[in-house]
Amino acid sequence: MARIVPPTRFPDSVAVSYSRSINKLISELGKVTLSVYDEQITPQIKLQKSRDDNSFYKLDAPLDVVQRAVDVIKGLSLGIFNSSVVQKTASKFVNSLNLFNKNNISNQGKVKGIDPTVSEPWLESFMKTSISENASYITNIKDAYLANIESIIYRGVKNGSSAKKVRDQLVERVGISRKRAEFIAVDQTGSILGQMTAKRHKQMGVSKFKWLTSNDEKVRKTHRDLSNKVFSYADPPSVGLPGEDYRCRCVAIPVFGDE
């Protein structure tokens, strides 16, 4: 009786762990932001609200205080999102993903007496590129966050918004950054997994794959239409390999020549 080839699996746990690691940094930066805001900017806003005229907008001093506070937040962000931490976070993610996929595809190959992971000359360069790209994604989250909170604070001060209203917007901004981190975690897990799977499948002589979705409510219609259909690695569908489309959790099941 022929042995059944283990299915290609999507590593949800790796994606969740990566998202949590990035969100830990975001939460830390969010706490620092609110602390500096409460201590240095809130008093300036309350001082202005207590005045009857608009002299606040005619004076440079209060805005200078705000600028210094924003600069403090930016400086502290460099300690939280320092290059070593960012690199370590990206590296841990990519290495965990590689280990997961390597074990998964090796088990598929064993059914046919093949081990595609014995020699992988492409892997080192692929890993370095993936780690570098993800380090950039993490840094970009920080940069976008800082640009947005600076805009929120200055707009609030100039428009005469209450300290609470501005603070609420800062809290909301943290939530937006967290959602961005979750998107990147799933998106990158799928993309890197799809490319690793394709390389390892081709390494063991597999030229075709069957598209398989995660079979849940999040699957988009275009991917449901591809499910269980067989494609050539040399000529994949227009959306690319399983996992390459944005936030895709689909996988490629190997189709061996004797099937």
What are these regions (language model features)?
Residues E172-E259:
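Acidic, glycine-rich two-metal-ion catalytic cores of nucleic acid-processing enzymes
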Residues M1-I176, F256-E259:
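N-terminal leader/targeting and assembly helices and adjacent pre-domain segments
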